[in-house]
Amino acid sequence: MAAMYVDIVTPDDAALPGALLTEITGVYASAQAFHELTGDFPDAGDIRVPQVAAALADELSVPGSVVHLARVRGDLVAVAVTLDHHPADPDDPDPWIGLLLVHGERRREGHGRALAGHLAARFREAGRTGLRLAVLDTNTTALAFWQALGYVPVDHRPDLRRGRECTVLRRELAGPREGRAEAGAAAGEN
């Protein structure tokens, strides 16, 4: 696999340029089956730039949120959203992955695994000891993906937005020398 470079967008960044929003919308629109499961867009088969801009603004309105844009050979292949802390549970010490989408035309190429490894390495290097995420119970493919990466179920509860049943998974983050290979020498940050 070619090198993956990850750019980040934080709440402090200015509005995203139109061309970048169009690229991000392409990733979102290519994940129709996922959006049919989530119901996050009114028509999962017709996701538009203003809808994605609003979704990203909503994600970035949460303190400590970051949008990660993964590129391979200049092409946007995946988008992820992370949170430094759970927005409704101040006692939870772990950061969270709120979203990881791989472009539909680039699935099964290792990009999701590489981006997940990059996110884990980023938080590990920041001194965090665990990483969590929630998967809709109806998304069995995502549940299998995350469990294959070493995430284990730790809770079951409704999500914050719509009350949909979710499995909460957690992965222990290895020390700075352990687990570095999984982060992928191909994943870097610009």
Regions flagged by a language model, labelled:
Residues 132-136, 147, 152-168:
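Conserved catalytic-core motifs of GNAT/GCN5-like acyltransferases
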Residues 142:
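Helix-turn-helix
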Residues 123-134:
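Conserved GNAT acetyl-CoA-binding A-motif
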Residues 5-107, 116-118, 122, 173-174, ...:
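Acetyl-CoA-dependent GNAT
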Residues 102, 136-137:
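Short amphipathic helical patch at the helix-1/turn junction of helix-turn-helix
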